[in-house]
UniProtKB/Swiss-Prot annotation:
Seems to be only O-glycosylated (is not affected by PNGase F which only removes N-linked glycans, but is affected by TFMS that removes both O- and N-linked glycans). This is Thrombin-like enzyme acutobin-2. Monomer. Keywords: Blood coagulation cascade activating toxin, Disulfide bond, Glycoprotein, Hemostasis impairing toxin, Hydrolase, Protease, Secreted, Serine protease, Toxin. Expressed by the venom gland. Optimum temperature is 25-50 degrees Celsius (at pH 7.0). Residues 1-15 form the Peptidase S1 domain. The keyword Disulfide bond applies. It comes from Deinagkistrodon acutus (Hundred-pace snake). GO terms for molecular function: serine-type peptidase activity; toxin activity. Its main location: secreted. Inhibited by PMSF (100%), AEBSF (100%), aprotinin (50%), benzamidine (50%), guanidinium chloride (48%) and urea (66%). It is an enzyme of class 3 (hydrolase).
Length: 15
């Protein structure tokens, strides 16, 4: 996942 400190691997979204 590009950018973001934490990202939901399952949804591939930035938190």
């Amino acid at each position: 996942v590009i950018g973001g400190v934490e990202c939901d691997i399952n949804e591939h979204r930035f938190l």
